[in-house]
């Protein structure tokens, strides 16, 4: 029996160049093909306002606290205008990044920043956390090679291997901190179709 029910909130997490967005799209297309109500969205972004904030965040050098607050403001708009209404209407919501990315990308830049991110979410955001998070685990050396081979880039893409390792270690740590929510998919040696099948298997869709 599928683990999915109406109003399930699924997020995909990990660093740059790991195929996370591809897996979001593949799961979205599969659920649509099964006539399951589903929407696909992303962070930072997902609404007109949040997408404008995204452009600032990914292409502008901001102070660490400014960057964190920008991400949180975009999330509030996204949650209130899109995610929560979709869940209340019975949709599965697939989100490409959510709070764990904020913890790793913005929280690491601040003293006790990871704890601060989750506390701010608890205190300021609507009371919602993902039901399930897939961490796409790809080694940093592979991820940075993939990023270097593509034309699109933002300020996070072009940082060096040390940055990629730091982000990778952060997500690994979060997967151990929240094992009841975060499922690790080891994907370094797998193609996108194989990763997709593992995700479907975990959701009891096959």
From Swiss-Prot:
Q: Which UniProt keywords apply?
A: ATP-binding, Kinase, Nucleotide biosynthesis, Nucleotide-binding, Transferase
Residues where ATP binds: 14-21
* GO BP of this protein: dTDP biosynthetic process; dTTP biosynthetic process; dUDP biosynthetic process
GO MF annotations in UniProt: ATP binding; dTMP kinase activity
Family under the similarity heading: Belongs to the thymidylate kinase family.
Reactions catalysed, semicolon-separated, are: dTMP + ATP = dTDP + ADP
For this protein, the record's Pfam families field holds: Thymidylate_kin (PF02223)
Task performed by this protein: Phosphorylation of dTMP to form dTDP in both de novo and salvage pathways of dTTP synthesis.
Q: Cellular component terms, GO, for this chain's entry? A: cytosol
Keyword Nucleotide-binding recorded: yes
Q: Know the name of this protein?
A: Thymidylate kinase
- State the encoding gene: tmk
Q: Which residues form a coiled coil?
A: none
SUPFAM superfamilies listed in its UniProt record? P-loop containing nucleoside triphosphate hydrolases
Give the EC number. Answer: 2.7.4.9
């Amino acid at each position: 029996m599928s683990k999915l029910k109406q109003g399930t909130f699924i997020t995909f997490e990990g660093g740059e160049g790991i195929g996370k967005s591809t897996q979001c799209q593949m799961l979205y297309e599969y659920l649509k093909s099964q006539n399951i109500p589903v929407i696909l969205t992303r962070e930072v972004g997902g609404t007109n306002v949040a997408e404008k904030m995204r452009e600032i965040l990914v292409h502008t050098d901001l102070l660490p606290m400014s960057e964190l607050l920008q991400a949180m403001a975009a999330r509030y708009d996204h949650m209130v205008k899109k995610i929560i209404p979709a869940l209340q209407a019975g949709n599965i919501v697939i989100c490409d990044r959510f709070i764990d990315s904020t913890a790793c990308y913005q929280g690491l830049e601040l003293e006790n920043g990871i704890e601060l991110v989750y506390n701010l979410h608890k205190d300021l955001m609507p009371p919602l956390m993902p039901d399930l998070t897939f961490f796409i685990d790809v080694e940093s050396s592979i991820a940075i090679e993939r990023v270097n081979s593509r034309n699109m880039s933002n300020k996070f893409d072009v940082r060096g291997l040390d940055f990629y390792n730091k982000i990778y270690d952060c997500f690994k740590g979060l997967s151990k901190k929240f094992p009841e929510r975060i499922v690790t998919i080891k994907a370094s040696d797998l193609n996108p179709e194989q990763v997709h099948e593992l995700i479907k298997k975990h959701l009891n869709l096959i």
